[in-house]
Amino acid sequence: MAQVQYYGTGRRKSSVARVRLVSGEGRVIINGRDFENYIPFAALREVVKQPLVATETLGNYDVLVNVNGGGYTGQAGAIRHGISRALLKADPEYRLTLKRAGLLTRDARMKERKKYGLKGARRAPQFSKR
């Protein structure tokens, strides 16, 4: 008999995470690697765990993630968003908890484009009075 799986897609900056929740003992596998090995920073590992901690389901599901694009921060945010959406499909009663924690909102902040005549998005070339 096939296990019940819950899917969720998360996005952050230029990262996209496709998340599957399967009932298990709480392992998190990202792109075929354990998430302790994949994400080198403890703070970002906590970001990934936030939805599971908020809904008190930390040891109930195995999380299988396929993520691409962006860097560590973007990928961690995308995974968090994807896990939140998948948990919502698993149990709609988590909506209020996840919403209050701000985990269902897509973080719309993106890198600002470089403008012509400037060195970066806002950095102007050095000004010389004389």
From Swiss-Prot:
GO biological process: one example: translation
Pfam entry (one): Ribosomal_S9
GO cellular component: cytosolic small ribosomal subunit
Keyword Ribonucleoprotein on entry: yes
Entry keyword set: Ribonucleoprotein, Ribosomal protein
Cystine residue pairs: none
SUPFAM superfamilies reported in the protein's UniProt record: Ribosomal protein S5 domain 2-like
Keyword field contains Membrane: no
Annotated GO MF terms: RNA binding; structural constituent of ribosome
Family (UniProt): Belongs to the universal ribosomal protein uS9 family.
Protein name in the entry: Small ribosomal subunit protein uS9
Lineage, uppermost ranks: Bacteria, Bacillati, Bacillota, Bacilli, Bacillales
